[in-house]
Amino acid sequence: MLQPKKTRFRKQFKGRIHGAAKGGFELNFGQFGLKAVEPERVTARQIEAARRAITREMKRQGRVWIRVFPDVPVSSKPTEVRMGSGKGAPDYWAARVHPGRIMFEVDGVAENIAKEALRLGAAKLPIRTRVVQRIAD
């Protein structure tokens, strides 16, 4: 699963996801992409599950690019623990995804296979997405 090799601090504030994506909203690598429509935190496990679903549907042909990286540590306290006594330990890693952000790109397969693969990958994610296609020049 994806996570940073080294971070400056173990824990971060929760933060909010305001506004549209400031970058990463165009297809840079593949012919087809999966674009986020709403803001949400996406965990490393969800990204990996979507990647596996896309790769499996493409039968390991073509190429898949992951355009989001989980760099936000999310902490949680154990169950049935009283409030207070500090912030919980880091539990998992997440990526803050803004609306308009391209999350996955695929290339090297037929259009119908690519769209079906991205649709199956989108089912593993907690946000509404849209399949986008590069406009032929």
UniProtKB/Swiss-Prot annotation:
<keyword id="KW-0687">Ribonucleoprotein</keyword>
<dbReference type="GO" id="GO:0006412">
    <property type="term" value="P:translation"/>
</dbReference>
<protein>
    <recommendedName>
        <fullName>Large ribosomal subunit protein uL16</fullName>
    </recommendedName>
</protein>
<dbReference type="GO" id="GO:0003735">
    <property type="term" value="F:structural constituent of ribosome"/>
</dbReference>
<keyword id="KW-0689">Ribosomal protein</keyword>
<dbReference type="InterPro" id="IPR000114">
    <property type="entry name" value="Ribosomal_uL16_bact-type"/>
</dbReference>
<dbReference type="GO" id="GO:0022625">
    <property type="term" value="C:cytosolic large ribosomal subunit"/>
</dbReference>
<keyword id="KW-0820">tRNA-binding</keyword>
<dbReference type="InterPro" id="IPR020798">
    <property type="entry name" value="Ribosomal_uL16_CS"/>
</dbReference>
<dbReference type="InterPro" id="IPR036920">
    <property type="entry name" value="Ribosomal_uL16_sf"/>
</dbReference>
<dbReference type="GO" id="GO:0019843">
    <property type="term" value="F:rRNA binding"/>
</dbReference>
<dbReference type="InterPro" id="IPR016180">
    <property type="entry name" value="Ribosomal_uL16_dom"/>
</dbReference>
<dbReference type="GO" id="GO:0000049">
    <property type="term" value="F:tRNA binding"/>
</dbReference>
<keyword id="KW-0699">rRNA-binding</keyword>
<comment type="similarity">
    <text>Belongs to the universal ribosomal protein uL16 family.</text>
</comment>
<comment type="subunit">
    <text>Part of the 50S ribosomal subunit.</text>
</comment>
<comment type="function">
    <text>Binds 23S rRNA and is also seen to make contacts with the A and possibly P site tRNAs.</text>
</comment>
<dbReference type="InterPro" id="IPR047873">
    <property type="entry name" value="Ribosomal_uL16"/>
</dbReference>
<keyword id="KW-0694">RNA-binding</keyword>
<dbReference type="Pfam" id="PF00252">
    <property type="entry name" value="Ribosomal_L16"/>
</dbReference>
